[in-house]
């Protein structure tokens, strides 16, 4: 009989760590990973046919739930035409037109295969456009695994550009400067220390890779102003927030426009798709129009474009989806906070739209250093208990929960019931932490 443990044993013999992305290994929660066989709506099913209410949603793409009928139909309609041509197709034009029509400030779009590729290309474009080298990022924000973005976040190494991964040369990370999220003075200081050398500031408008941390009131607008004053570009990494917070992403949600925007996840409808986009005067610096080179054999893949286009068409034509998922997330968040207050659990909940995270900390969480104070051992205990009750959460304290349109209020009620039972089961551990 096939089992997750058996597959993991086999995988470890031929795949580093047994997984193709580190967080999937479940090491942070001291378990072996589940191997999934299928998914539908709000549910995942492992290879042993156990059912889970899924709040990972493939790390964000499945905003309409798994195996959406319209998306699958769109994919099925193009499959018989061929899987890859290495040539332009109509759907890549259609999806670019769709993005331009939905996202504020975007005039041109270039398709790639992942969020990492999108960010890597956007940074190269910013450097080519401004003819400057340095990039400011924020500690705790994740922008993919390209060398220049893998910079250690913490203490005196923040602005020194010390790599946060073996194999990243010092000079590759040396032009990456690190500021403190939600701290505008840390950004101003970097501009003062590096006058006329900063090409761009890149930020997750909502930091969703250190849990979920919203920007404080006015922070993004001030950041935009500082960039304009210093002739630097503002890059919004909307791989997670794009088409999730609103049809126009974080730019629409917060009313702040960036110069370049990167997309992934939702844009592919579950297929591997990324994109970077911006004003025409910037985007026309990309080859073959300009001298900033970027290419990809599978960029604009016809099958992936069909999936992404179908999802975006649904989101554009049914704006009520956003009100629906936000209300469900609010219902989930409010219910969870009532349980936390009832048992005086040391948990702080952050929510932006349909993104949530419960930090196992009694203190407010507004940046990376505060997020790091969370008790990961307690989160691991919470995760295990919730998983045993059929609730699939991210196997890390520092990841988001995603609510989809496929989640029902019955799903949420079951989740809250499991959460209360879990807190009761771990009450003695909670008391030790308070």
UniProtKB/Swiss-Prot annotation:
Provide the GO MF annotations for this entry.
Answer: glutamate-1-semialdehyde 2,1-aminomutase activity; pyridoxal phosphate binding; transaminase activity
Its UniProt entry gives the catalysed reaction(s) as: (S)-4-amino-5-oxopentanoate = 5-aminolevulinate
A cellular component term, taken from the record's GO annotations: cytoplasm
Where on the chain is N6-(pyridoxal phosphate)lysine found, per UniProt?
A: 265
Which coenzyme or cofactor does it need? Answer: pyridoxal 5'-phosphate
Q: Which GO BP terms apply?
A: protoporphyrinogen IX biosynthetic process
User: What residue ranges are annotated as transmembrane?
Assistant: none
Against InterPro entries, the record matches this protein to: 4pyrrol_synth_GluAld_NH2Trfase, Aminotrans_3, Aminotrans_3_PPA_site, PyrdxlP-dep_Trfase, PyrdxlP-dep_Trfase_major, PyrdxlP-dep_Trfase_small
Q: Member of which family?
A: Belongs to the class-III pyridoxal-phosphate-dependent aminotransferase family. HemL subfamily.
Q: Which PANTHER family match?
A: GLUTAMATE-1-SEMIALDEHYDE 2,1-AMINOMUTASE, GLUTAMATE-1-SEMIALDEHYDE 2,1-AMINOMUTASE 1, CHLOROPLASTIC-RELATED
Q: What is this protein called?
A: Glutamate-1-semialdehyde 2,1-aminomutase
- Origin organism is Ruminiclostridium cellulolyticum (strain ATCC 35319 / DSM 5812 / JCM 6584 / H10)
Q: What is the lineage of its organism?
A: Bacteria, Bacillati, Bacillota, Clostridia, Eubacteriales
């Amino acid at each position: 009989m096939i089992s997750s443990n058996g597959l993991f044993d086999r995988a470890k013999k031929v795949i580093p760590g047994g997984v193709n992305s580190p967080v999937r290994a479940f090491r942070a929660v001291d378990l072996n990973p589940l191997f999934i066989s299928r998914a539908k709506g709000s549910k995942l099913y492992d290879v042993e046919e156990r059912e889970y209410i899924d709040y990972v949603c493939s790390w964000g793409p499945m905003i309409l739930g798994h195996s959406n009928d319209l998306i699958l139909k769109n994919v099925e309609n193009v499959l018989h035409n061929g899987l890859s041509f290495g040539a332009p197709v109509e759907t890549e034009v259609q999806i670019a037109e769709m993005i331009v029509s939905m996202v504020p400030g975007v005039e041109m779009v270039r398709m790639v295969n992942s969020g990492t590729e999108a960010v890597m290309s956007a940074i190269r474009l910013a450097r080519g456009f401004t003819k400057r080298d340095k990039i400011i990022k924020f500690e705790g924000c994740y922008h993919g695994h390209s060398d220049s973005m893998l910079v250690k976040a913490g203490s005196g190494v923040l602005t020194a550009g010390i790599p946060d991964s073996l194999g990243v040369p010092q000079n590759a990370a040396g032009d990456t400067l690190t500021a403190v999220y939600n701290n505008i003075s840390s950004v101003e200081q970097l501009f003062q220390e590096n006058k006329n050398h900063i090409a761009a500031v890149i930020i997750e408008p909502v930091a969703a890779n250190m849990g979920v941390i919203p920007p404080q009131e006015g922070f993004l607008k001030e950041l935009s102003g500082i960039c304009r004053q210093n002739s630097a570009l503002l890059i919004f990494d909307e791989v997670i927030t794009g088409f999730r917070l609103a049809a126009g992403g974080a730019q629409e949600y917060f009313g702040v426009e960036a110069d370049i925007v990167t997309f992934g996840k939702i844009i592919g409808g579950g297929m591997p798709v990324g994109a970077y986009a911006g004003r025409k005067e910037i985007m026309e610096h990309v080859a073959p129009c300009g001298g900033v080179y970027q290419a990809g054999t599978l960029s604009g893949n016809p099958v992936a474009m069909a999936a992404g286009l179908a999802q975006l068409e649904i989101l554009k034509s049914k704006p009520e989806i956003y009100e629906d998922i936000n209300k469900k997330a609010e219902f989930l968040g409010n219910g969870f906070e009532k349980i936390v207050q009832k048992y005086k659990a040391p948990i702080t909940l952050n929510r932006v739209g349909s993104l949530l995270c419960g930090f196992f900390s009694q203190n407010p969480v507004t940046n990376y250093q505060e997020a790091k104070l969370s008790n990961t051992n307690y989160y691991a205990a919470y995760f295990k208990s919730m998983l045993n009750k059929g609730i699939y959460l991210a196997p890390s304290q520092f990841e988001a929960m995603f609510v989809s349109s496929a989640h029902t209020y019955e799903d949420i009620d079951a989740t809250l019931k499991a959460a209360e039972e879990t807190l009761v089961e771990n009450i003695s551990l909670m008391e030790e932490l308070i």
